[in-house]
Amino acid sequence: MAGLTIVADVSEEPISADNVREYAHIDDGVETTVINNMIKSSRLYVENYLGRSLLNRTLKYSIDYVDEVDQPLWEGTRIGPDMTIRRRYLQLPRPPVVSVTHVKSFDDADTETTLASSKYYLDNQREPARIVLRNGETWPTALRVANTIEVTYVSGYGAAR
């Protein structure tokens, strides 16, 4: 199924249980596990609300197909072939994108092919960030129906503390 999955989650949270204890004047008797769970759930809530990764993590984004370019309806007759044009980029969710690890495609026999990094570049000057094909390059063809392209990338503002 196409979607976004976490490959490697954050190694530590933005604040520690001791910081919370000190700020909220909580006794040492309260379990650290409870406080750590509250910190993690708070971070996840903020990330889901914002649609962003606050701390660096590795994500895998799988898609079923590359969208086609929207073309306006044509009135009258047109001379030339009727063809579809694929977009030259893939938008990546959960900004900010730090780096792309790899872009892979899968054919009907589930054979994995890694797209050479010289064939695309990361455009993270805009949001959402996107992978853009270089001039003269095309997306792989003869792909399977589901999860045809997989992008693994690092997203987030940096490590905790």
Regions found by a protein language model. Give the residues of each.
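Divalent metal-cofactor coordination and adjacent catalytic microenvironments
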Residues: 1-161
